[in-house]
Amino acid sequence: MTDALTAFGLTAADSGHFADVLAAASSNANTNVSMMGETFKYCAPVAGALGFSVEDTAEAIGLMGNAGIKASQAGTSMRSIMTNLTGDVKLSGAAIGDATIATTNADGSMRSLSAILADCRVAFGGMTEAEKANNAEALVGKNAMSGFLALMNAAPEDIAKVSGDRKSVV
């Protein structure tokens, strides 16, 4: 856990909050704290470097867990997804045309992971299954494609459930 804390720029004093976030997310998703810790081992350095919050990262991990993508598989997928979200996200489809999703704020800082993924979900909602697969592969690669599609296909109720309780611990 201390490695993940350090990666997010947190201190030992934040360990209680970090544990609360993991516990809340895991209790609302098909995963557990141990598997979430394994996932964080792989993706926390990238998440922290990009300025993504522990809360948003835990939400994404929980949503992947609901799709059966857990532990190291989720960690490597999350790491790849986050790495590929460092520039503008370019998507295309017959119904949406060419779309660009900004990943940075006007000051150059990264937008929140939840906001970026929410915008991607809107774009993916207007695509055929084939377009979703093609865009996911082009954006994050074949190895992370299943994890990314799990995030894109998450039901609004699942997103609310996974994020709901963890926001109360912030």
PLM regions and their residue ranges:
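Short coil/turn linkers that connect adjacent helices within long alpha-helical scaffolds
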Residues: 29-30, 47-50
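Alpha-helical architecture feature
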Residues: 1-26, 35-43, 53-170
